[in-house]
């Protein structure tokens, strides 16, 4: 029996149904191919309901057209997948392990039942890349990067200059900065899966791609140049320990201006360059060997370093005290007390105390000198792509390395301050080698290997950081450095080596060194700010496994980083921030759009919610009123298929904003059933949004599917917007094509939209002559004429002022025509309107037009066009009424009410529109744009009649805005 059939098979059918699909008698069994914690539901237990399943054939959707499957395929193939099909989603078995589970917006692969084939790798699968654990992946790299040359050759000098007390403060301050940064790093790194890139990945996902790339590239540059610093330190120590190894020797006859009895052969500066290039190339070969080679070599660099530090401490305890003139006193309380205070003074270029020297050292300068000795905490996170478990290794390994080195420094301050006199601390550059047991050479080896180990870690982490930035595909210029997930970043390594060799060739890095320190501090402040923002927002997705964090700690860490930057050098701080700002701007201009769900988006969301709540449900005060137009994109007329919105509608929407401030909502309605047109609506919405962005109009796009346009607009006008951010003005095109397209549907829809706007208390702006509306480059001259007939809350006045703020209308002047009754006092009305405009801070020429009872036909030939339109409208309305009378029935309106026609009232409406149109043509035929009040549709009049009224109003006016306000003021007299 096929696995897809359930049939009654005599007396044994039920037994076969019971026993066939059960494997091993278990109801649930593990799915070995994916996750042992995921179980697969067994076949349906027939039980008492088995009788309802008889004689039913079940065919899986994926089997249609695929031929007949064998029994094995039914059990092991698609049957497993189809048991949860009724939920409408892929089962956990199908989605576990996809990259989309990490929060990245990646398209999931199609299911085989979509008709696509599954690609099966032939032969042996590719072995997984070697992954590192906490010790070799994080702790050792961090320790190698932190323990550098400063501890060996400058730390004793720092203790002598700052004293034990301020030395402890100095170490504690710098250690606190890195400790707080490690806490923030641990929190972010344990908040989900982490790909390559280390701090760049964390900062970018928290603060956005622009901030992430700008800080990430600065951090990459800092690592690359730091590699050169470490290489030069190793080579310089080697040449001082073995002068005979110099290739380009120079003869020294004077030392500090004093002639020596015998000339001294010393290595030349070119030796630094040659040896530095050779060492850099050798280190690059190790890096090219991959993670496996680095893991083998790293202990060889670290073990001698730890051994040399151990020998230094043995030498401290075994220091000879029989020669006090040598300056080494052994561990003595007297030395401890003498060295407790600071001794800031002038020194020469070599750091030797000299009253005539050119350098004065203070606490701030010592911070800049010592801080590179605590950097390197990002060495483990830089290789996050090579770690087995980032959420475990990064916090434990980084924190252990930070605490270990900080404790070492604090203990060293106490011991160095108690083992020698201050003069010895300030004059012996290699005091650590002098006191080391059993001989100084072991410290020389430690210095060389520590700097080489730090250089190796820099040349390992920097290329991976650059490759991670390139793989995010934000900056096209970095595409050359892209690598596959399991590949080594060879091109990025070559580029890093090129930068490193260039700095080695320069040789003198005194000006670059502070900038490198700034890049490290800039990265640390970015990590702290990221954790601060995520902690403060506390989004539902913020669930780090590392629980020992708080937004206040991150804030203190970020503040401390910035303070230390300015303590070291405010000028180099400005340079580092300026470089990061330039990269930020470049990414914003040239980079591709990327949405990583960063913290800024969450902050904007929460700020928007808080602002929306603070607005409340009360009406907005006129001083704070902004137009929020609801732009009706395609209500009538046909546009090209690739143009989702009339181009001039976007131009007009921009005219309603002062200096771009405001928001427009562009909506369009698709006729049809939502279930059938949902995908079409999504594509149309994307197309409309893209077009709005192309027109540089700030707004949002919405597509609504409805049975017809009237129902769709009614739903939009009721539900669009939130709180006080609902649209307050409906903007649409005047249907000039209604007479030749549809004599019934367009008028009915047009009148229905206006009535819905009045009911919803929305303002209305109808644009006649939209095709001739000027764009931002078409400058207009003349006047903007307002025909103020009814009180509209000042909306028409406000629109005219907004038009003047645009380049296309800034050369125009405003004329305000007040339409008065025949018995009104024109002069008094004019004076009142001028006073009103003055109080509103608006400039306009006021003209009062009195609508007298005059016969329009006595005005001569100037209004022949209006008269012809009037006569034509009369004839069409008479024919319409005659047709109704001949039918002998009482027709109903669109709202179901009976149509009641008063022919005298119809004549009055037509005559009023005729007089208003003739007045507009008399005064405003050459106006840039005319604004006139919108008359509401008369009750119980057919929509056809209203369209005749409106056609008569706009006759021969090339460009007109028909405006209706709502029952509230949008302008105010008061400040």
Swiss-Prot record:
Pfam families: AA_permease, SLC12. Expressed in young seedlings cotyledon tips, plant vasculature, root tips and axillary buds. Expressed in root vascular strand in the pericycle and other parenchyma cells bordering xylem vessels. Expressed in the xylem/symplast boundaries of rosette stems, rosette leaves and cauline leaves. Expressed in stipules, trichomes and hydathodes. Expressed in pollen grains. Residues 154-167, 236-273, 318-359, 420-434, 512-515, 566-571 are extracellular. It is found in: Membrane. It comes from the Eukaryota. Disruption phenotype: Bushy plants with small leaves, short roots and short inflorescences containing a higher number of stems. Alteration in pollen grain development, high number of aborted siliques and few siliques with low number of seeds. Keywords: Glycoprotein, Ion transport, Membrane, Potassium, Potassium transport, Sodium, Sodium transport, Symport, Transmembrane, Transmembrane helix, Transport. One of its GO terms (cellular component) is Golgi apparatus. The chain crosses the membrane at residues 133-153, 168-188, 215-235, 274-294, 297-317, 360-380, 399-419, 435-455, 491-511, 516-536, 545-565, 572-592. InterPro entries: AA-permease/SLC12A_dom, SLC12_C, SLC12A_fam. Glycans are attached at residue 256. It is a multi-pass membrane protein. Residues 1-29, 104-124 are annotated as: Disordered. GO terms for molecular function: sodium:potassium:chloride symporter activity. Residues 1-132, 189-214, 295-296, 381-398, 456-490, 537-544, 593-975 are cytoplasmic. PANTHER family: CATION-CHLORIDE COTRANSPORTER 1, SOLUTE CARRIER FAMILY 12, CATION COTRANSPORTERS. Cation/chloride cotransporter that mediates potassium-chloride and sodium-chloride cotransports. Involved in plant development and Cl(-) homeostasis. May be involved in long distance Cl(-) transport. Does not function as an H(+)-dependent cotransporter. NCBIfam families: 2a30 (TIGR00930). Belongs to the SLC12A transporter family. Cotransport is inhibited by the loop diuretic bumetanide. This is Cation-chloride cotransporter 1.
């Amino acid at each position: 029996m096929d696995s897809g059939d359930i049939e009654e098979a005599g007396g044994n059918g039920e037994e076969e149904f019971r026993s066939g699909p059960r494997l091993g008698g278990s109801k649930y069994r593990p799915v070995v191919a994916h996750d042992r914690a995921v179980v697969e539901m067994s076949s349906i237990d027939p039980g008492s309901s088995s009788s309802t399943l008889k004689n039913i054939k079940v065919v899986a959707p994926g089997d249609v057209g695929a031929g007949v499957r064998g029994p094995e395929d039914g059990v092991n193939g698609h049957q497993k997948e189809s048991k949860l099909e009724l939920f409408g989603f892929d089962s956990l078995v199908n989605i576990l392990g996809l990259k989309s589970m990490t929060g990245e917006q990646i398209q999931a692969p199609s299911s085989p039942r979509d008709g696509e084939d599954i690609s099966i790798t032939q032969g042996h699968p590719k072995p997984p890349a070697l992954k590192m654990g906490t010790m070799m992946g994080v702790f050792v790299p961090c320790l190698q990067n932190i323990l550098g040359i400063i501890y060996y050759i400058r730390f004793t000098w720092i203790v002598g200059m700052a004293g034990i007390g301020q030395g402890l403060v100095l170490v504690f301050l710098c250690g606190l900065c890195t400790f707080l940064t490690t806490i923030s790093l641990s929190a972010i790194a344990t908040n989900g899966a982490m790909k390559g890139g280390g701090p760049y990945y964390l900062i970018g996902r928290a603060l956005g791609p622009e901030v992430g790339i700008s800080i990430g590239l600065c951090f990459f540059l800092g690592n690359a140049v730091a590699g050169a610093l470490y290489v030069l330190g190793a080579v310089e120590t080697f040449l001082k320990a073995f002068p005979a190894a110099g290739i380009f020797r120079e003869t020294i006859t004077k030392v500090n201006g004093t002639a020596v009895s015998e000339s001294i052969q010393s290595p030349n500066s070119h030796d630094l360059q040659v040896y530095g290039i050779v060492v850099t190339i050798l280190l690059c070969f190790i890096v090219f060997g991959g993670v496996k080679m680095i893991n083998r070599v790293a202990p060889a660099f670290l073990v001698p370093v730890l051994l040399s530090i151990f020998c230094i401490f043995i030498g401290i305890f075994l220091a000879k005290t029989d020669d006090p003139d040598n300056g080494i006193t052994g561990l003595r309380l007297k030395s401890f007390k003498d060295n407790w205070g600071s001794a800031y003074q002038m020194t020469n270029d070599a750091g030797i105390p000299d009253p005539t020297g050119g350098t004065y050292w203070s606490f701030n300068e010592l911070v800049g000198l010592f801080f590179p000795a605590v950097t390197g905490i990002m060495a483990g996170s830089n290789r996050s792509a090579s770690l087995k478990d980032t959420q475990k290794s990064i916090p434990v390994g980084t924190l252990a390395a930070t605490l270990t080195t900080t404790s070492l420094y604090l203990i060293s301050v106490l011991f160095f301050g108690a083992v020698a006199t201050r003069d010895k601390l300030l004059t012996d550059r290699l005091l650590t080698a002098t006191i080391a047991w059993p001989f100084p050479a072991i410290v020389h080896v430690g210095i060389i290997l520590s700097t080489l180990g730090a250089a190796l870690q820099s040349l390992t982490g920097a290329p991976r950081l650059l490759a991670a930035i390139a793989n995010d595909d934000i900056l096209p210029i970095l595409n050359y450095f892209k690598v596959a997930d399991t590949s080594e970043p060879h091109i990025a390594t070559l580029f890093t080596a090129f930068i490193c060799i260039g700095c080695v060739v320069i040789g003198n890095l005194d000006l670059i060194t502070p900038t490198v320190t700034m890049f490290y501090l800039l990265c640390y402040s970015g990590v702290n700010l990221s954790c601060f923002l995520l902690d403060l927002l506390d989004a539902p997705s913020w669930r780090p496994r590392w629980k020992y964090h708080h937004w206040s700690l991150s804030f203190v860490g970020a503040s401390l980083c910035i303070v230390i930057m300015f303590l070291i050098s405010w000028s180099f701080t400005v340079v580092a921030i300026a470089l990061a700002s330039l990269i930020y701007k470049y990414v914003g201009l040239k980079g591709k759009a990327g949405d990583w769900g960063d913290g800024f988006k969450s902050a904007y969301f929460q700020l928007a919610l808080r602002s929306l709540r603070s607005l409340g449900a009360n009406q907005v005060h006129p001083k704070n009123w902004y137009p929020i137009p609801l732009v009706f994109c395609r209500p009538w007329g046909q546009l090209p298929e690739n143009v989702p919105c009339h181009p001039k509608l976007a131009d007009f929407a921009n005219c309603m904003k002062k200096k771009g401030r405001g928001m427009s909502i562009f909506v369009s309605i698709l006729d049809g059933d939502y279930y059938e047109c949902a995908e079409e609506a999504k594509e149309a919405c994307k197309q409309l949004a893209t077009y709005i962005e192309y027109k540089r109009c700030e707004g949002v796009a919405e597509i609504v599917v409805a049975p017809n346009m009237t129902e769709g607009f009614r739903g939009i006008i009721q539900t669009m917007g939130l709180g006080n951010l609902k649209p307050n003005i409906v903007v649409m095109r005047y249907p000039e094509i209604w007479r030749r397209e549809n004599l019934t549907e367009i008028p009915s829809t047009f009148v229905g939209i206006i009535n819905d706007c009045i009911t919803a208390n929305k303002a209305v702006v109808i644009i006649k002559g939209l095709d001739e509306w000027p764009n931002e480059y078409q400058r207009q001259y003349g006047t903007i004429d307002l025909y103020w007939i009814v009180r509209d809350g000042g909306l028409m006045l406000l629109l005219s002022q907004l038009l003047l703020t645009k380049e296309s209308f800034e050369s125009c002047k405003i004329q305000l025509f007040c339409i008065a009754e025949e018995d009104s006092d024109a002069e008094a009305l004019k004076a009142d309107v001028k006073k009103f405009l003055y109080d509103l801070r608006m400039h306009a020429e006021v003209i009062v037009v009195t609508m007298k009872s005059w016969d329009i036909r006595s005005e001569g030939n100037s209004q022949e066009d209006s008269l012809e339109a009037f006569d034509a409208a009369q004839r069409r309305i008479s024919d319409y009424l005659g047709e109704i009378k001949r039918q002998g029935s009482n027709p109903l309106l669109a709202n179901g009410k009976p149509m009641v026609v008063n022919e005298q009232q119809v004549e009055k409406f037509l005559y009023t529109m005729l007089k208003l149109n003739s007045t507009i043509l008399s005064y405003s035929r050459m106006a840039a744009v005319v604004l006139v009040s919108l008359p509401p549709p008369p009750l119980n009049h057919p929509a056809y009649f209203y369209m005749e009224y409106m056609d008569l109003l706009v006759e021969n006016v090339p460009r007109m805005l028909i405006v209706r306000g709502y029952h509230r003021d949008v302008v105010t007299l008061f400040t």
